[in-house]
A protein has these predicted regions:
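C-terminal helical "tail/cap" subdomain of flavin- and related membrane-associated enzymes
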Residues: 2-7, 340-465
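Hydrophobic "anchor" residues on beta-strands that sit immediately upstream
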Residues: 9, 32, 134, 166, ...
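Conserved mid-domain beta->alpha element of the FAD-binding
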Residues: 11-27, 173-174, 206, 292-382, ...
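Conserved Rossmann-like nucleotide-cofactor binding loop
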Residues: 17, 40, 179
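Glycine-rich FAD pyrophosphate-binding loop
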Residues: 26-49
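Short phosphate-binding/catalytic loops that engage adenosine nucleotides
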Residues: 30, 69, 133
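Active-site-adjacent segment of FAD-dependent monooxygenases/related oxidoreductases
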Residues: 44-127
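Conserved FAD-binding catalytic core of PHBH/FMO-like flavoproteins
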Residues: 126, 133, 139-143, 148-296, ...
Length: 465
């Protein structure tokens, strides 16, 4: 499709996905205005209720590479090589991400990267502005009128109470998050499906400061997890040698987030459930009270576009829970896929239709995968039988690397569509259920017999799980 042509496009939302997409559009020669309801993140505080740091992996890197900002982002990204599981007794178990000999990015081993949301957003906003995008902060989208004869018209409300009318525009992209104003307008159109649901669990963050010498208080190349059945604590390292710790727990019950609103109750709970953590918080109660409890919302909708005028991307199309570390990566993949479709298709309407068809099943799949991964991390990662299964799978991946690719690697270190990875993972689960049914599996798990039996099922076209 021919690029540019002087078309005026608007991006609603200057978060991570919106600023990346604005940058990509400018590189294609379009006139781009970005409207963001919040104040400029470079001058104002980060709003509460958003995770401080994020996990960046292959799907996200592809989008950053396409936009020409990967090198700048690598400077603020911290490699994370695997999970470090913490038992109640203080014992730890390290589980490596990826395949041992698989190459990663920038000469690093295969890993994920911890990045600051605020610093990444700043890089993307400034790159978009340098490329010529006009970014208007403090503009809350109040109305979207897509059906005018001359294009889309928008109305924005500013912090001072005044209103601004914009348009006509050729098309508008909704990258304005889980409570999208653009999607809200699409919901009033015919044959638009929408579902919103809150998880029964929420989260609360704490910042673990560096030690007295200015160093990390825990292993810095690992995602730390304290699995405790109905709840769990996670800690992700930051380049400034802090850790962002996040408690995921139900709202209800004696150890629920509602009960833990009392800082003394929260401190007693942490001392009981995560005793090895308490030494790293000299004033736990003060730190606990610095951060709000936040909810976890999930959004599904269909389609993700309307004719050639409106298109949803990122959380506006597919808000998911954070337990696979793929929310941002999925949003960046939206940008990559749509950019590739614009190269391939002959018109915006064809590109948008192909985008919805490709990304809707992927968005549904990564939501399911994230929910499954929460159960795995919370309930199973301390289970010896589950850990044995993972050791068998790792052995299969190492020995049959051209065939057996673990589900985590398919999701995190490949560009296999999420729904295809989910289907492959279900089949692998069925194979492993057969393998783990052997009464002597604990004694022969690393034998050739076990490996060959698993691969015989894997290679059989008749085995569908």
């Amino acid at each position: 499709m021919e690029q540019g042509n002087g078309e005026r496009l608007a991006v609603i939302g200057a978060g991570l996905v919106g600023s990346l997409w604005a940058l990509m559009l400018r590189k294609r020669g379009y006139e781009v205005d970005v409207y963001e309801r919040r104040a400029d993140p470079r001058t104002g505080p980060v709003l509460g209720g958003r995770s401080i740091n994020l996990a960046l992996s292959d799907r996200g890197w592809r989008g950053l590479e396409k936009a020409g900002v990967a090198e700048a982002v690598r400077e603020i990204a911290l490699p994370v090589l695997g999970r470090l599981m913490h038992g109640v007794d203080g014992a730890t178990t390290f589980q490596r991400y990826g395949l041992p000999d698989a190459p990663g990015h920038f000469g690093d081993p295969q890993c994920i990267y911890s990045v600051s949301r605020a610093r990444l957003n700043r890089i993307l906003v400034e790159a978009a502005e340098r490329e010529g995008a006009r970014i208007h902060f403090g503009h809350a989208c109040a109305a979207v009128e897509p059906d005018g004869p001359d294009g889309v018209r928008l109305r924005f409300e500013r912090a001072d109470g005044s209103a601004v009318d914009v348009g006509p525009l050729e098309r508008v992209f909704g990258t304005d998050g889980a409570f999208s104003a653009v999607r809200d307008r699409m919901m009033r159109m015919d044959r638009f499906d929408f579902e919103q649901k809150y998880l029964g669990h929420g989260y609360r963050e704490l910042a673990m400061q560096p030690d007295a010498a200015g160093g990390f208080r825990m292993r810095e190349d690992a995602l730390h997890i304290w699995p405790r059945g109905g709840y769990m604590l996670m800690a992700l390292p930051n380049p400034d040698r802090t850790f962002t710790c996040t408690l995921f727990a139900p709202y209800d019950g004696p150890d629920g987030l509602d009960a833990l609103a009392d800082p003394a109750a929260a401190e007693a709970f942490f001392a009981r459930a995560f005793p090895d953590v308490m030494q790293h918080f000299p004033d736990f109660q003060a730190e606990w009270m610095r951060h709000p409890t936040s909810s976890l919302v999930m959004v599904r909708c269909n389609p993700w576009h309307r004719s050639d005028r409106l298109c949803l991307m990122g959380d506006a199309a597919h808000a998911i829970v954070p337990f696979y570390g793929q929310g941002m990566n999925c949003g960046f993949e939206d940008c990559s896929v749509l950019s590739e479709l614009l190269d391939r298709e002959g018109s915006w309407s064809e590109a948008f239709a192909a985008y919805s068809a490709a990304r809707k099943p992927a968005g549904d799949a990564i939501l399911e995968l994230a929910l499954r991964n929460y159960i795995e991390m919370r309930d199973k990662t301390g289970d010896p039988r589950f850990l044995l299964q993972k050791r068998i799978e790792a052995r299969l991946a190492a020995r049959f690397s051209g065939e057996w690719l673990p589900l985590y690697s398919q999701v995190t270190f490949s560009h296999t569509p999420y729904h295809e990875a989910l289907a492959a993972g279900r089949r692998q689960d069925a194979i492993m259920a057969r393998v783990m049914d052997r009464p002597d599996i604990a004694d022969v798990w690393d034998s050739n017999d076990v490996a060959e039996a698993a691969m015989a099922l894997f290679r059989s076209p008749d085995f569908v799980g």
